Design a protein with these regions (language model features):
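Generic helix N-cap/helix-start motif at coil->alpha-helix transitions
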Residues: 94-101, 126-135, 147-148, 160-168, ...
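Solenoid-like repeat scaffolds
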Residues: 46-55, 68-69, 84-93, 119-129, ...
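Solenoid-repeat scaffolds in large eukaryotic assemblies
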Residues: 114-117, 147-151, 181-185, 370, ...
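Residue-level signature for tetratricopeptide repeat
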Residues: 106-107, 136-141, 172-173, 509-510
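Structural motif corresponding to the intra-repeat A-B loop/turn of tetratricopeptide repeats
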Residues: 111, 144-145, 176-177, 514
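Long, acidic/serine-threonine-rich intrinsically disordered regions with weak helical/coil propensity
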Residues: 2-94
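TPR/TPR-like (Sel1-like) alpha-helical repeat modules
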Residues: 158-163, 174-197, 203-231, 441, ...
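Extended alpha-helical solenoid scaffold regions that build the rod-like backbones
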Residues: 230-421, 425
Length: 532
């Protein structure tokens, strides 16, 4: 009996219950019972589990649709991360649970952070709607020939119902040498009539009931993988229209033809290699080794400026590259590199020459670049790693002064209160000092945290903090999630350093009202201090 109960816990491709020695199958689980879904603890960022409860779903949907269509800056994306992935009650006004969860799932998929997806599934094991995430996760790792990584997810999630994922789980059980469990799940699905002929045939071959056959399917990555594993002497020639997941699988399974064996007289094969390189399936270095195998006469190499125009685009690239390797003059090198780059771009292959181009430019001293190639050089060279600048305190300017230590959690509230009033005393004596908006932002943030400003310093500046009524209403109603979306929308594609100080003031004022001090402090320390 204990053994049966253990099996019921393990085999969850379908919901299985055992009563009176009869197996019952429930294949219709609803998302409507889900009340909570998320990844981060609300308290981590000073939020509440009710952060979405009072918001109108129409506002949420329109704002999220706008945000997900943009290429957000790092900080804007961080706010969206916190808003969407914090564990919270699901809103229920003018938005269904499925709609809201789909925004979370689509966002995680767009980020392509598979560790984050795994963590989300671990913390939300009963989300049947999470099958979209599970499929994305399993397909990614299988297309990269990492079957064990694909299979591990089935030990985490409690509920799957789709035929595809159930088939995937059965195959994983076979792969893990848990054939009895695979057979039980197979028998259950057979009773339901949910198994297709292709999978049944491959299952029987893998279980040893039938001999291997030559049946191949490109329907999905699982079926293509099963084809590979059950066909003797498996060979597959990809075509231009071959799906990318198959290209990835072939590359990571060492099933692609080595570039040195590609027939350079075969135009389609060359173009396939170029497309695969652009899609990061082939290495750029392999493509350029292929270009080296082309044969050109001395006149073509000497008169490349005219000769390459008479060739097919891929042949022209081979000629330009070979001529580049014979060139030592920097202006001529840059001319050849720019012609190569232009040729790749015109053939819609912008990613096939980015790493190689950056590497070649790295070997050219920047001070020897002619002025007419400066833009080309700066745009395509390898980005320099910027050294992280340190904050330098300057007590002559309030927003650059030692009070910034408080926002780095280096000083206590009583200490910063004393330091603030001491600095304001000096500023009051200095008749030439004019309070800037940056100074005001710091003082208002300190006041928001409870710093008491002495009455004699309270009129050093005029400041009216009038937030729009729409935002004010959201704050009063506890619609923190929606307010965070609005902040992310305001920042959009801009880096914090590029925001106007009025925008910084507006955002910091909202965060002060919400008491979201960590996010506020990050903005202040990015925008205000003097850095060296």
């Amino acid at each position: 009996q204990n053994k049966n109960e253990d099996s019921n816990d393990v085999i969850q491709g379908i919901k299985i219950e055992q009563q009176n020695e009869k197996i019952l199958v429930n294949n219709s689980l609803s998302v409507s019972d889900i009340k909570l879904a998320g990844l981060y603890d609300p308290e981590e960022n000073g939020l509440s589990i009710d952060m979405w409860s009072n918001s109108n779903g129409e506002d949420i949907k329109s704002t999220l649709k706008n945000l997900t269509s943009k290429d957000l800056s790092k900080f804007s994306e961080k706010i969206l991360d916190i808003a969407l992935l914090t564990n919270s009650y699901i809103p229920n006004t003018n938005i269904s649970s499925k709609e809201f969860l789909d925004f979370k799932f689509d966002y995680l998929i767009k980020k392509e952070n598979f560790d984050l997806i795994k963590e989300f599934l671990i913390k939300n094991p009963n989300l049947i709607e999470g099958e979209k995430l599970i499929k994305f996760y399993t397909d990614h790792y299988l297309s990269n020939s990492q079957l064990d990584k694909s299979c591990e997810i089935f030990e985490i999630t409690n509920l799957i119902s789709s035929d595809y994922l159930t088939n995937f789980k059965m195959y994983c059980l076979i792969h893990q040498d848990r054939r009895d469990e695979a057979q039980l799940l197979f028998d259950l699905k057979t009773e339901l009539g949910d198994l297709d002929k292709f999978f049944v045939n491959k299952f029987n071959i893998l279980m040893g009931y039938k001999k291997s056959n030559e049946e191949l399917s490109e329907k999905n990555i699982l079926y293509f993988h099963l084809s590979h594993k059950t066909i003797k002497n498996f060979e597959y020639e990809p075509k231009i229209e071959t799906p990318k997941f198959i290209w990835n699988y072939l590359a990571t399974s060492n099933l692609l033809k080595n570039a040195e064996f590609v027939d350079i007289e075969n135009e389609e094969q060359i173009k396939l290699i170029e497309i695969a390189t652009n899609d990061e399936v082939y290495k750029e270095e392999d493509l350029f080794k292929l270009y080296m195998r082309f044969q050109f006469d001395i006149n073509q190499l000497l008169n490349y400026r005219n000769a390459y125009k008479l060739l097919e685009d891929y042949e022209a690239r081979a000629l330009l590259y070979q001529r580049l390797l014979l060139t030592s003059e920097i202006p001529k090198k840059l001319n050849l590199l720019s012609l190569l780059k232009k040729s790749f771009d015109q053939s819609n292959l912008p990613n096939a020459f980015d790493e190689k181009l950056a590497s070649l430019l790295k070997n050219i001293p920047e001070d020897e670049i002619p002025s007419n190639y400066t833009t080309f050089f700066m745009k395509n060279k390898e980005p320099e790693k910027l050294a992280e600048l340190k904050i330098k305190l300057n007590n002559k300017v309030f927003h650059q002064s030692k009070v910034l230590n408080y926002f780095q959690n280096k000083t206590s509230l009583p200490q910063v209160e004393k330091e603030t009033n001491d600095l304001l005393k000096k500023i009051k004596k200095n008749k030439k000092y004019v309070f800037s908006l940056k100074d005001i932002i710091v003082v208002e943030s300190l006041k928001s945290d409870g710093v008491q400003i002495l009455r004699k310093y309270q009129k050093l500046y005029d400041y009216n903090n009038n937030l729009p009524s729409e935002i004010n209403t959201m704050i009063v109603n506890g619609e923190t999630g929606l307010v965070l979306l609005k902040i992310s929308e305001i920042i959009g594609e801009d880096n914090l350093e590029d925001l106007g100080i009025e925008s910084v003031d507006y955002i910091v004022s909202i965060l002060n009202e919400l008491k979201l001090v960590d996010l506020r402090n990050e903005i202040l320390l990015k925008v205000l201090p003097l850095k060296v």
